[in-house]
Amino acid sequence: MKLALISAFGVGGATIAGVIIGFLFRKVPHKFNDAILGFAAGIMLSAAILGLIIPSLEEGNVWVTSVGILVGAIFLNLADKLTPHLHHITGMDQEAHADRQNHLNKVMLFVMAIAIHNLPEGIAAGVGFGSENINNAITVALGIALQNIPEGMIIVSPLIMAGVAKKRVFFIACFTGVIEIIGTMIGFGTVSVAKAILPFALAFAGGTMIYVVSDEMIPETHSHRYERMATYSLLAGFITMLVMDFYIG
């Protein structure tokens, strides 16, 4: 429980750390942003497979795992219908903003999108610790935390462009981080109480992470003509997580 709580604050705090970096480097070049986000996508994809999907297969069977992955993806697909895709917002240029009210409307949608996507990521980290396999849990939590840093960085620019005060931007970032902490404790608590759902819960969490990588992160990294670099960055992130998991395990 103590380790899960520490991890929860670490995962949520990584988003805030990213926001602080975003304040320091407000105008991050698309090339650099795509490389960092691609690297984070690779880490997240590797963590989902190594820390969630493979353990789900070991705890259950291929059918439970397959259904869990699919249900996790469908869950986020339904959530996406309530919020805009992150790459539709983070890639906006100033000339695309019609007026201040339009800015603020998009900001609120942006915050909702981040929060909704952070909840299942937090649940994924919590489910990992609920499985009592600490090595796999650390792999997942570390992968999510590393992914949250560039995600926190990209929160800053759209909010400032919309005219939101710096203090309020920081408060909003804290809110999205708290959502992830709550998600971690929900995942840990649910699996701890009902061990029978562990294989499904692991696969569900893995499915949500893969969906985020495919539906949000990869399109964002491929939207500024740096696709090749983003692809190699993703591979680098995947391999990095693979090596880290090998030594952690």
Please describe what each predicted stretch is.
Residues 1-249:
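Intrinsically disordered, metal-sensing/regulatory segments
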